[in-house]
UniProtKB/Swiss-Prot annotation:
GO terms for cellular component: cytoplasm. Pathway: Carbohydrate degradation; 2-deoxy-D-ribose 1-phosphate degradation; D-glyceraldehyde 3-phosphate and acetaldehyde from 2-deoxy-alpha-D-ribose 1-phosphate: step 2/2. Catalyzes a reversible aldol reaction between acetaldehyde and D-glyceraldehyde 3-phosphate to generate 2-deoxy-D-ribose 5-phosphate. It is found in: Cytoplasm. Its EC number is 4.1.2.4. Its main location: cytoplasm. InterPro entries: Aldolase_TIM (IPR013785), DeoC (IPR011343), DeoC/FbaB/LacD_aldolase (IPR002915), DeoC_typeI (IPR028581). This is Deoxyribose-phosphate aldolase. It comes from Klebsiella pneumoniae subsp. pneumoniae (strain ATCC 700721 / MGH 78578).
Length: 249
């Protein structure tokens, strides 16, 4: 399998486009994601030096053959754990983490046990998250809240648990629920976290206006599809001034 060469930052790329690319988790995590989709994501990521590509676990090892060089300044591989419903046992999630890392993942995004959150069983949720963090270390872990199904109190509780157990990121959504990274839910997350750990927005992020709105709330990683990322990159290549916040930071 021929690897896709990562040439680093394209010399023709403006600084705004480059900075945006380093905020993107390029994702092919739908049930219908194919080998061609994974390859297309790898090619786009290598071209723009996108920070990471996330695929379903069955594609992780294949993706690692396309993106063999990882580390600072390179394209990382990420993978989901307990995806998409979060209802896997903790032991299963731990095994998934170990397999993903063995296959080349350098980030893991774990779905919280939504049913346990809705049931108010926060002791279970805490231990579930803690063991995934422990299994992943030193690979950073994100917890996916699937905010569509949670109310404000539940979002705040899980955010606090995430901080307590050492999660590096709180992520809004899987992209499988009816809604994803809404301004309303991201505002709650940002207010609760207060910068202690980072925020990833995912689900329904399809244009620059949405990216900017979420960035202004503190989102610093964007889970987006190949089509959405391509659209935003093309706009920023022509109009870098449309994302002034990125150049101000």
């Amino acid at each position: 399998m021929k690897a896709i060469k990562n040439k680093g930052q394209d010399k023709t790329m403006n600084e705004t486009t480059h900075r945006f690319a380093r905020l993107v988790d390029l994702s092919a995590v739908q049930a219908t994601s194919t080998e061609a989709d994974v390859r297309a994501c790898a090619e786009l990521a290598a071209r723009y030096n996108i920070i990471s590509v996330h695929v379903l676990p069955c594609w992780t090892r294949f993706l690692s053959t396309l993106l063999p060089q990882q580390g600072t300044g390179e394209v990382m591989i990420g993978g989901p754990v307990g995806f998409p419903g979060g209802g896997h046992t903790t032991d299963t999630k731990v095994q998934e983490v170990r397999q993903l890392i063995a296959d080349g993942a350098r980030e893991v995004d774990m779905v919280v046990n939504i049913g346990k959150v809705l049931s108010g069983d926060y002791d279970y949720v805490r231990e579930d998250l803690r063991r995934v963090v422990e299994a992943a270390a030193p690979v950073p872990a994100k917890v996916i809240l699937e905010t569509h199904y949670l109310n404000e109190e539940q979002i705040r509780r899980v955010c606090e648990i995430a901080v307590e157990v050492g999660m590096k990121w709180v992520k809004t959504s899987t992209g499988w629920a009816p809604t994803g990274a809404t301004v309303e839910k991201v505002r709650i997350i940002a207010d609760q976290l207060k910068g202690r750990i980072d925020i990833k927005g995912a689900g329904g992020i399809r244009d620059l206006a949405t990216v900017r709105a979420l960035y202004q709330l503190g989102v610093r990683r964007f889970g987006m599809s190949h089509g959405a990322v391509t659209k935003v990159l093309a706009e920023l290549e022509q109009h870098p001034e449309r994302f002034p916040e990125l150049n101000a930071d």
